[in-house]
Design a protein with these regions (language model features):
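Conserved AMP-binding/adenylate-forming core of the ANL superfamily
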Residues: 9-54, 58-62, 79-84, 140-143
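Conserved S/T- and glycine-rich ATP-binding loop of Class I adenylate-forming
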Residues: 47, 64, 95, 163, ...
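A short helix-loop-beta submotif of the ANL/AMP-binding
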Residues: 45-46, 52-80, 88-94, 203-204, ...
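Conserved AMP-binding/adenylation subdomain of ANL enzymes
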Residues: 187-204, 212-234
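AMP-binding (ANL) adenylation modules
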Residues: 2-5, 39, 52-55, 209-213
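Conserved pre-ATP/AMP-binding loop-to-beta segment of ANL
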Residues: 121, 133-168, 175, 198-204
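Conserved AMP-binding A3 loop
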Residues: 21-23, 164-188
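Structural core segment of the AMP-binding/adenylate-forming
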Residues: 38-39, 66-143
Length: 234
């Protein structure tokens, strides 16, 4: 919100031929948060996201928390068995998934004992596998943005120790283990990186670290603090 207020017309994100300003990113996050609540998300419930490093994945790093939810990003390289286990363990209320991964997600849905969640399709027109895939959701991501209220009054967490995200190991040594991050930890991670990297205001960051790995090491939040420019690569 601070970056939106101070630097609304600075570029926030570039992905192929798509470019956003910070005022546009903030507006989309507000609308996404509102849309998530409108389709049933309640405080403390999990939103699972299976997507590559795209603008939608970046927006989810902020919007899910703004809606009071807990973000669960899943490794896009996992097999259907492992994804099904994560569905059962995390019990998400909503799944946001890139249609480029619909095949493995569909297999996971058939195997999972827990599928009581709404599915939102991210259709990436710049990626052939995503653009040509068959949607599996009740809404598209852009429909959810349109459903959202641009004047949505998002709330800060009641407590700094409230959960902000739920991350899982990849299960290489057995079943995946879930780890809950809190808002305080996410804030300190983002703030601590700035002096450690000797970062200045308005940096440009090529996002090569997958955002499903520890929320991209918190760099999305760091770039929000610094009003930087993120370049996404799928």
């Amino acid at each position: 919100e601070r970056t939106f207020n101070l630097y609304p017309n600075m570029v926030s994100l570039i992905y192929g031929n798509r470019e956003y300003l910070w005022r546009e990113t903030y507006d989309r996050c507000i609308r996404l948060a509102s849309g998530l609540q409108k389709i049933g998300l309640k405080k403390g419930e999990v939103v699972t996201v299976i997507a590559a490093n795209t603008p939608e994945m970046f927006e989810c790093q902020f919007a899910v928390a703004m809606a009071g939810g807990v973000l669960n990003t899943v490794n896009i390289r996992l097999d259907a068995d492992t994804i099904a286990y994560i569905f059962e363990h995390a019990e998400p209320r909503i799944l946001i998934s890139d249609t480029g991964f619909s095949d493995v997600i569909s297999k996971a849905l058939k195997q999972s004992k827990y599928t009581d969640f709404k599915i939102i399709d991210i259709i990436d027109e710049q990626d052939r596998s995503s653009a040509s895939a068959t949607p599996i959701g009740q809404y598209t991501y852009e429909q959810l943005i349109e459903l959202g209220d641009g004047k949505f009054n998002w709330q800060l967490p009641d407590d700094e120790w409230d959960a902000i995200c739920l991350n899982y190991t990849s299960g290489t040594g057995g079943l995946p283990k879930g780890v809950v991050y809190h808002h305080r930890g996410a804030y300190l991670m983002a703030m601590g990186t700035i002096p450690a990297w000797q970062m200045q205001m308005h940096p440009t960051y090529l996002y090569t670290v997958p955002m499903f790995h520890c929320n991209g090491w918190g760099h999305a939040w760091m770039m929000g603090l610094l009003a930087g420019k993120v370049i996404c690569t799928r």
